[in-house]
């Protein structure tokens, strides 16, 4: 059984006299920066010239610098940029400023695990990955709570890398909820698998296929939207709250019987074989190479797929229906 670590297990004093540079001020960046600041840590934010996030960071009372200056000034660097831009920013602005004894941090292991970023042997390389979006990381911290985190050590130059990772997790509120130790490989491969097979790829394909099946059979698109997309949140909320058991305990007997007897016909042996193939593509680096090359070539296929998905009938139906949802209008 995996062990969870909490506030008493981590020593925030390891960050007390350090300057932490948060590179990027998006969803995770703003949460990490503000939570660390409120934990009494000296924080600077590294942004590229002309960044639209600069004013937001300054309005929050944070010192903003360009990325190279932030990396130079900091003892601790946390890269919170999209995976596809990290390598270029690292090579241009961060690597020249990585002196011995510094800490290089990530919230996802992609670039380290797949060799896009190769750090010098003289720095600690760690990961602290909150298992929730940035707005939740920030909101729960302000409420005196936190979001569970994963933490890992890739390189321990100082002999303190593990303790440092735990201290950082405490600084952003993770140890209030509990943090779980992993490795860069395990986090990266399981994260990609979950995204592709279940959370994003699998769920999106399932929703669209269900919608298309009902519409093709002559049912109103609006009803198909409600049954195959809108109600997903109702079910997922129950699962998150208490697992599959709570969900099944909360739905009707009719729904539960249909779940248990028909669900296995959707995820077949062929589906499971495809899941294993997708996992092999992740483990071998095939997916990573494909993604890197796609971005290096200007994302032509990615852009075309985005355009095609945006034109799917479920998007237009959903747009019209959501306009009538009064509870969404204030968001």
Swiss-Prot record:
InterPro entries: 6-PGluconate_DH-like_C_sf (IPR008927), KARI (IPR013023), KARI_C (IPR000506), KARI_N (IPR013116), KARI_prok (IPR014359), NAD(P)-bd_dom_sf (IPR036291)
Lineage, highest ranks first: Bacteria, Bacillati, Cyanobacteriota, Cyanophyceae, Oscillatoriophycideae
NCBIfam families to which the protein is assigned, alphabetical: ilvC (TIGR00465), PRK05479.1 (NF004017), PRK13403.1 (NF009940)
Protein source organism: Crocosphaera subtropica (strain ATCC 51142 / BH68)
Family listed: Belongs to the ketol-acid reductoisomerase family.
Pathway named in the protein's UniProt entry: Amino-acid biosynthesis; L-isoleucine biosynthesis; L-isoleucine from 2-oxobutanoate: step 2/4; Amino-acid biosynthesis; L-valine biosynthesis; L-valine from pyruvate: step 2/4
Cofactor note: Binds 2 magnesium ions per subunit.
Catalytic residues, chain numbering: 108
Residues that coordinate or bind Mg(2+) 2: 191, 227, 231
Database matches in SUPFAM superfamilies: 6-phosphogluconate dehydrogenase C-terminal domain-like, NAD(P)-binding Rossmann-fold domains
Domain KARI N-terminal Rossmann: 2-182
Residue sites binding Mg(2+) 1 per the record: 191, 195
GO cellular component, one term: cytosol
Keyword Amino-acid biosynthesis: yes
Alphabetical list of HAMAP family matching this protein: IlvC (MF_00435)
Molecular function terms from GO: ketol-acid reductoisomerase activity; magnesium ion binding; NADP binding
One record GO biological process: isoleucine biosynthetic process
Residues binding NADP(+), per UniProt: 25-28, 51, 53, 83-86, 134
Cofactors, names only: Mg(2+)
Protein name, UniProt field: Ketol-acid reductoisomerase (NADP(+))
């Amino acid at each position: 059984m995996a062990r969870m670590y909490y506030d008493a297990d981590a020593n925030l004093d390891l960050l007390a006299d350090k300057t932490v540079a948060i590179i990027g001020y998006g969803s995770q960046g703003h949460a990490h920066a503000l939570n660390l600041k409120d934990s009494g840590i000296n924080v600077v934010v590294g942004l590229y010239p002309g960044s639209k996030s600069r004013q937001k960071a300054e309005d929050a009372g944070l010192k903003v610098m360009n990325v190279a200056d932030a990396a130079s000034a900091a003892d601790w660097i946390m890269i919170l940029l999209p995976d596809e831009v990290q390598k270029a920013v690292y090579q241009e602005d961060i690597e020249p400023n990585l002196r011995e004894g510094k800490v290089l941090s990530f919230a996802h292991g992609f670039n380290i695990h797949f060799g896009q970023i190769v750090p010098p042997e003289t720095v600690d390389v760690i990961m602290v990955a909150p298992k929730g979006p940035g707005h939740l990381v920030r909101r729960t911290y302000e409420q005196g709570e936190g979001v569970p985190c994963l933490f890992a050590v890739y390189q321990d130059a100082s002999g303190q890398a593990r303790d440092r990772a735990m201290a950082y997790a405490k600084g952003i509120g993770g140890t209030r909820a509990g943090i779980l130790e992993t490795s860069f490989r395990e986090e990266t491969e399981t994260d990609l698998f979950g995204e592709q097979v279940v959370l994003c790829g699998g769920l999106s394909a399932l929703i669209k296929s269900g919608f298309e099946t009902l519409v093709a059979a002559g049912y109103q698109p609006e009803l198909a939207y409600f049954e195959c997309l809108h109600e997903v949140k109702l079910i997922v909320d129950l699962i998150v709250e208490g697992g599959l058991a709570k969900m099944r305990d909360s739905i009707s007997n009719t729904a539960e019987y249909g779940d248990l007897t028909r669900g296995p016909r959707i995820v077949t042996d062929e589906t499971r074989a495809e899941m294993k193939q997708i996992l092999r593509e992740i483990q071998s680096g095939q997916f990573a190479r494909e993604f890197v090359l796609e971005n290096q070539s200007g994302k032509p296929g990615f852009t075309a797929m985005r355009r095609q998905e945006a034109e799917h009938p479920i998007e237009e139906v959903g747009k019209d229906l959501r306009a009538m949802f009064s509870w969404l209008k204030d968001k």
